[in-house]
């Protein structure tokens, strides 16, 4: 199967969703996940254009940037599989594919986009920080007697497009030097609300309770994942470290 990708995935009046926009080798379930994610987001973008014409341009640009990110990340994630096949079989077929995937991974790394493993990420609208970074942040949280959360030195809050229900809206997003593209939700947890709770409470259970008291309740595992992500992305830092 031949790989292909569009130079642009959407414009007002046209959306290239799923395989219409790009195709990756059917080496794993990556392509299925990509198509599901693309179709889901395309429906939201189309709905937004119909009910809020003023958001059409922002919506199609959002879709275009997400599709480009998805393609580059799945190509990056497929590189180890091709390299393994090339080492096992040594044929030009696998060697050329391994080289192409490796080159694509380098391009993705140089793009300025956050590096991540997206093998379990369907929509790429939430955090796709490397699991190792999030886990390391979680381990550091567990090592503290007091959370001591303070605002990250490079944290900035800016307005950008995001998904709210079945439409694209302009919303406040959190960005940092480690995550310049910004994010708002992780596992359904509102990061803006979370950082306020975390900075106001030195004990994680108290922060979780405060978060749930101020809005839609989330589970403790989801809260902990979002909290760890906030530290890993540089939105929060440990101002007081007591072990």
Where in the sequence are the language-model features?
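Flavin (FAD/FMN) cofactor-binding core of flavoprotein oxidoreductases
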Residues: 1-11, 67-69
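Short FAD-binding loop at a beta-strand-to-alpha-helix junction that anchors the flavin cofactor
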Residues: 9-28
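Active-site-proximal substrate-binding core of FAD-dependent oxidoreductases
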Residues: 22, 28, 41-97
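Short amphipathic alpha-helical face segments that pack within enzyme cores
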Residues: 34-45, 193
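Extended amphipathic alpha-helical segments with heptad-repeat/coiled-coil character used for oligomerization
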Residues: 70-134
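Acidic, low-complexity/disordered tracts enriched in E/D and polar residues
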Residues: 116-199, 221-243
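Short acidic, hydrophobic short linear motifs in intrinsically disordered regions
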Residues: 194, 201-214
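Short, basic interhelical loop/turn and adjoining N-cap
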Residues: 214-222
């Amino acid at each position: 199967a031949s790989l292909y990708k569009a130079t642009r995935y959407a414009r007002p009046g046209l959306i290239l969703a799923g395989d219409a926009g790009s195709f990756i080798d059917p080496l794993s379930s990556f392509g299925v996940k990509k198509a599901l994610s693309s179709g889901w987001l395309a429906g939201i973008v189309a709905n937004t254009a119909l009910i809020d014409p003023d958001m059409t341009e922002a919506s199609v640009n959002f879709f275009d940037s997400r599709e480009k990110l998805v393609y580059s990340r799945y190509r990056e994630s497929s590189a180890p599989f091709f390299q393994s096949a090339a080492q096992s079989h040594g044929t030009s077929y696998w060697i050329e594919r391994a080289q192409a995937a490796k080159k694509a991974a380098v391009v993705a790394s140089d793009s300025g986009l956050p590096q991540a493993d997206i093998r379990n990420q369907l929509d790429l609208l939430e955090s796709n920080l490397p699991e190792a970074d999030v886990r390391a942040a979680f381990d550091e949280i567990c090592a503290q007697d007091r959370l001591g959360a303070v605002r990250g030195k490079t944290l900035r809050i800016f307005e950008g497009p995001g998904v709210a229900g079945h439409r694209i809206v302009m919303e406040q997003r959190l960005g940092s030097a480690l995550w310049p593209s910004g994010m708002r939700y992780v596992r359904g947890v509102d990061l803006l609300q979370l950082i306020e709770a975390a900075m106001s409470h030195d004990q994680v259970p108290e922060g979780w309770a405060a978060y749930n008291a101020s809005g839609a309740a989330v589970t403790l595992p989801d809260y902990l994942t979002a909290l760890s992500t906030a530290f890993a992305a540089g939105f929060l830092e440990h101002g007081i470290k007591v072990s």
